[in-house]
Amino acid sequence: MKELEKYSTCLKRIDEFSQNLGIKKKDRTIFKMKQSENENEKCLVLENGSFDSPEPWFVIDENDEIHTLLSLQSLKNILESLKQSQKENFELRLEKAIYQQIPVDFNDVWTVAMDEIKQKAQNGTMEVSIDLEKLISKIKQEHPNLFVDMQAMIERVNQNERL
């Protein structure tokens, strides 16, 4: 009875995950992993679906843990997608950091920042670990002409009010 409950719980978890992926119940493939006579071998028994069903395929092991099987191409596509998302996220964070410092010309600051980032990457620093606000502040100190000098602008406005 306990075995049936555990298996049922596994199926519910697979159902939830399949729904998130948009895989219909009839299209999902589930294998049950069983010990074979040889202790160095496991046997996968097809419980549901077919070998033509879309990925991922689900495997329920002897401990009722759920595993997935993916083709190398699918894994590669997932990793490329994650890498692209990470790049876009990094670029958005850099864009935000630049705009917060009020650049005179965004593209000039972007170019200087990317040069600094590439230099840090060559020295072994991972892009994701770079503090972008700190980097842009450093660029602002080294290249003040690339940014609007708000203090000077306020002083000019105050002087014009006095006249």
UniProtKB/Swiss-Prot annotation:
It comes from the Bacteria. InterPro entries: UPF0763. It holds the Pfam family DUF2603. Belongs to the UPF0763 family. This is UPF0763 protein Cj0993c. It comes from Campylobacter jejuni subsp. jejuni serotype O:2 (strain ATCC 700819 / NCTC 11168). The lineage of its organism: Bacteria, Pseudomonadati, Campylobacterota, Epsilonproteobacteria, Campylobacterales.
